[in-house]
């Protein structure tokens, strides 16, 4: 390849070069799959539900079933199947096939149980109070660390509901209270984390937390509405006592 003699002409030649639309679509897919786009996940769920000729109510039931499955059984499909009743296995097989579930996402539209839960953060956090006796980290465990710990914080989906327009001290309190759960969850599911310092564990998981906090899928007002419905903040954006207490416990550990 010869060196261009005129860089302006070279730039024009680049812009005039032809390409197939499929090439750009492949690039989008190639460079997007590591990220997470809730709209893509929801669109895929809707597409597959429509393909299965489901009603809206049936689709919503499926989403609730998938989130409950994730919250109580985790994300690894093979492990989940081994621990289900025969009736549960039949329902699981149906959902797995219908929504083409995978353990690990390789493309933007791939559906994992955790992606479905995070894309539906508001619903996930609404379901939590009903299932926290059956989760990896239970309500009683979190309350042993901080009395009246807010159960709606007990999944990493919660980070996507923190309104970035709240007063700075409220944001920090919500984040730190949520981090107390993330810390306990990491220690529970990852044996090697049990001997690590709290700050090391939190630092290792910080990128996922920051991605949730940076999510713009919901508007600040929509996020605030969820926080108000969970009674985590008041009309002035001030956090409640349980949140403040959990944040204080976390800070004492680091």
Swiss-Prot record:
Question: What gene codes for this chain?
Answer: N
**Tree of life domain:** Viruses
Q: What is known of its domains?
A: The N-terminus is involved in homooligomerization.
**Family, per entry:** Belongs to the phlebovirus nucleocapsid protein family.
According to its UniProt entry, the function of this protein is described as:
Encapsidates the genomic RNA, protecting it from nucleases. Displays high affinity for single-stranded nucleic acid. The encapsidated genomic RNA is termed the nucleocapsid (NC) or ribonucleoprotein. The ribonucleoprotein has a non-helical structure. Serves as template for viral transcription and replication. After replication, the nucleocapsid is recruited to the host Golgi apparatus by glycoprotein Gn for packaging into virus particles.
Q: Name one GO cellular component term.
A: ribonucleoprotein complex
Instruction: Detail which positions bind RNA.
Output: 33, 36, 76, 114-115, 194
User: Which cysteines does the record link by disulfide bonds?
Assistant: none
Where is it mainly found? Answer: virion
Q: Which Pfam families match?
A: Tenui_N (PF05733)
Q: What is this protein called?
A: Nucleoprotein
């Amino acid at each position: 390849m010869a060196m261009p003699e005129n860089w302006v002409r070279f730039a024009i030649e680049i812009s005039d070069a032809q390409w197939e639309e499929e090439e750009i679509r492949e690039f989008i897919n190639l460079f997007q799959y590591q990220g997470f786009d809730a709209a893509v996940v929801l669109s895929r769920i809707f597409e597959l539900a429509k393909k299965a000729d489901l009603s809206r109510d049936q689709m919503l039931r499926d989403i609730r079933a998938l989130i409950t499955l994730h919250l109580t059984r985790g994300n690894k499909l093979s492990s989940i199947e081994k621990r289900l009743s025969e009736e549960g296995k039949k329902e699981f097989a149906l959902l797995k096939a219908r929504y083409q579930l995978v353990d690990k996402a390789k493309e933007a539209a791939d559906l994992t149980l955790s992606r479905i839960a995070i894309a539906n953060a508001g619903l996930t956090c609404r379901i939590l109070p009903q299932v926290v006796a059956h989760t990896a980290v239970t309500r009683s465990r979190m309350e042993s660390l901080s009395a009246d710990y807010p159960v709606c914080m007990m999944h990493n989906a919660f980070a996507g509901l923190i309104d970035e327009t709240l007063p700075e001290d409220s944001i920090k309190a919500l984040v730190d209270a949520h981090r107390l759960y993330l810390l306990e969850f990491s220690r529970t599911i990852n044996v090697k984390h049990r001997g690590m310092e709290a700050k090391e564990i939190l630092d290792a998981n910080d990128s996922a937390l920051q991605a949730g906090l940076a999510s713009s899928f919901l508007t600040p007002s929509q996020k605030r509405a969820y926080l108000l419905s969970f009674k985590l903040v008041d009309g002035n954006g001030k956090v409640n006592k349980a949140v403040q207490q959990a944040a204080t416990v976390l800070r004492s550990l680091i």
